Structure formats: structure tokens, C-alpha cells
Amino acid sequence: MAEKSTTTTDSPTAPVLVTGAAGHLGANLVHRLLDDGVKVRVLVRAESRNEAIQGLDVERFYGDLRQKESLRPALEGCRGVYHVAARIATIDGNRKFRREIYECNVAGTRNLLQAARESEAGRVVVTGSFSAVGYDLDNPSLPSDETMQFYPLERTMPYERSKAFVEHECWRAAAKGQDVVVATCCALMGGWDYYPSRLGRTLVDYANGKLRAYVDGGFEFVAARDIVEGHILCMSKGLSGEKYIFSTEYKTISEILDIFEEVTGIPRPAKRVPAGLMQIFAEASSLYLSHFHPSFPQRFTPGAIRLLQLCRHANTQKAQQELGFKPTTIRQAVKDAYQFHYNHRKAITNPNAKPPEQEG
């Protein structure tokens, strides 16, 4: 039975731990927590790129989710944990890649949950993926809610399967009495995107005039500020053993390109590539690259195109009614992302791209 949160450290001055703080969602979450006056610890790997947390007033702990003992120092004395870290990818990859996905996402979550329970670190909010939420097999565009079970017998990506297994680890822990909540994230758009993310790269390439064509489809997109708010709501109001879906808006690719054009001043591409043709090209190129050049970035993967063609919608009524979640707009999220890539990363080099609008 779902219960209210009962953290073991009552002091409001006790820190919270954020894993994956150097990533897109993690960086946005850390900035928001610091703005709220929360004492923040971050768990990062020493070999990772950690530009996102440079200069921030956080306690740094170095560890690896695959090594349970390395997590304990960061967890001691915490009053809550945001487990955001994950290996995200839309490729099938080779055997080594699939093993890495499993060890980082599934085994890593299991280790984190066990170490948090043993350290009495309070509630753990785990970032879930909308890709691991089920859908109507006969009509995938029907809105999916938290009750819809992931169907593993359809063609799915290793990442999708791993996030479904991550949820299983959460429910196993909750069944043993641990305080765990899952905050489900959709396609993320916003600032503090240092790596950058797939959507961030697409926006930068668009602004730099490198996006020549597009594929039809659509997906649920979430603004960084909305998914961050969702995590905080899960920590403060969520029911243990439950998951909540957070999305800002469903948008077609054509609608996203309209927003890109408005924000950047660069005309959208007129050429539309048929999805079937793009799928054939993506299958062939992904097979070759995954086996012979696994580190080469792939923009249009078979998995990404398949997801876009499903045109999946999300039902966020549970988060809105139980937690008071109020989504903003994807237009604002694109503006936030563009401002970050233009002003902070200096990644927009096209002289025809207009400067971002100033806030306020």
C-alpha cells in the first residue's frame, strides 16, 4: 500500500544527493535545488565531463554506480536521493554496449537503492523513462498512463528494456519497505545541456543550417523546468511505491520545427523524407556503425525513428491531480535551450541565426 514519505533524517539542513548531476536533467535539478536553498551533494565519476557542476556550491563525491561500496560515503547523512544517472541511447549497439547499458542502469540502480537503504538516506526519487511505459499495441497514439505495462515482446531498444528493469528494481525495493518514487521523463528540452543531448544537438545543428530535411512523427516533450519540478514534487508529495509521468506537451516534428524557426530565425527545412525510406537507411547505417564504429554518433537511429512513428501521447492527470503538477510550454523550453547554446556554449556559429530573446 502506498504511504507518505517518512525520511530518516528530519533536519532540513541535511543534504540531498543527486546522481548524474553532470547530465542534462541532473544539472537542471542541481541548479533548482541550490536556488531553493537546499544543501546538495553530487555523485560523479572522476573520468566524466563535469562542466555542468563547475563553480557550483555542492559537495562532490566520486564513485561508480556499478561499485556499491563507492556509494556509501555520498549517502551517509542524506535526507533524500535523486537518482538521475543513466546511460541513455537510441541504438541497439554491440554486445559490449548492451552490457554497459545493463550494468549502468539496472545494476547501478539496484546498488544505489541497496546502499541508500543501508545508509538510511531517506526517500529515493528515481528518474524513469516514458519509453518504459506501456501503450496500446493496436493504437499506440492513445494516451498512456502509469497503469500501462511495458510490453517486452515488441521490438525495443536496450535502453527501453533497461529502464523497464529499473522500475522493477524500484518496486522490489518498495515491496521490502523502502521509500521509492519514480518520476517518469519524456523527451527533454531546456538549458544547462553541456554534452549536449540529442535534442540539444538537433537544435544547434538546425540553428547552424545543418538540418536539411526531417521525418514525420511526434512525441511527448518535457521542459527541463517541468521535469525538475516533477522530481521535487515526487520527493515532497509523492506516494512511495508509485510512479508519475511528467510531460509538457505532445508535439509533431513539424510543430517543433515551427518553434525552432520562430526562436532561431532560420527557415525550417522544406524537404520531408518518407519514414519508410529513412527507416531502411537508418537500419543499414546503424548495423554498420554499431559493429565497426560504435563510438560514432548516430543522429537518425532505427529506434528513434520507430518511436517518432508511434506518435505516443502521455496522460499526466495523476501528476496533476495528486501532486499539483502544472506544465509550462515547449516553446519556452526551446527558448531556454537556445539561449544556453548561444550564450553559454557559444555553439551557434551561423551569422544568420538571431540572438536569443532576453528574459524579462
Describe the predicted segments one by one.
Residues A14-D36:
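N-terminal Rossmann NAD(P)H-binding glycine-rich loop of SDR-like oxidoreductase domains
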Residues G128-S129, H168-G191:
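Conserved beta-loop-beta element that borders a ligand/cofactor-binding pocket
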Residues E103-Y159:
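Conserved Rossmann-fold NAD(P)-dependent oxidoreductase catalytic core, especially the SDR/UDP-sugar
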Residues T90, S129-S141, L188-W192, S197:
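Conserved catalytic-site region of short-chain dehydrogenase/reductase
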Residues G230-Q298, T316, Q321, R331-G360:
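Mid/C-terminal beta-alpha module of Rossmann-like enzyme folds, strongest
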Residues E47-Q54, V58-A107, A115:
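NAD(P)H-binding glycine-rich loop region in Rossmannoid oxidoreductase-like domains
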Residues G93, F150-E154, R201-V222, D226:
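A conserved pocket-lining segment of Rossmann-fold NAD(P)-dependent short-chain dehydrogenase/reductase
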Residues N111, F165, R198, V215-M235, ...:
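Substrate-positioning beta->alpha
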